[in-house]
Amino acid sequence: MSIVHFGSYTEARAHLKDLLDAAERGRVATVRRDTATTAMVDVNRLRHFLSSLIPARAEVVPEAGGWSVFIPGLPVAADGDTFDEAIAEMVDALREYADDWQDHLLDAPNHRENWGVVQLISLSDDDQLRDWLVGAAR
């Protein structure tokens, strides 16, 4: 089995197991609907790829007896009394941003290019996001 492609939604629905099996194995799995083609991808593979492609570039600085975290280029920042608290707050702030992006920011010109980081945030658990922020390999 190589590429799995179905030319219509109806055909894909009838072969959903084949699409899912192909995606889970890392094969190309696509569905065409009208003029759009959509890929099905295993979540763990996509998350791993995005985390290796998108560095967090988080900057953590001591400030006023605590710690502040921000990511240049993203409208997200967090503070905490300790380093770990600041990182935990940043995980929460990233989740809020991803929710806002999905809800109303995805078409805003100054946010639409954040698609990849929003996918990474949404596909990660809290520990994975923490590791991504501090640069730990998982």
Language-model features, listed with the residues they occupy:
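Short beta-strand/loop turn elements enriched in aromatics
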Residues: 1-9
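Hydrophobic pocket/interface hotspot
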Residues: 12, 69, 86
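Short aromatic-glycine-(Arg/Gly/Cys) micro-motifs in beta-strand/loop hairpins
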Residues: 54-73
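Short, charged, surface-exposed hinge/linker loops at domain edges
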Residues: 3-4, 14, 18-56, 88-138
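A short, exposed loop/beta-hairpin motif centered on an aromatic-Gly-Thr core
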Residues: 5, 72-84
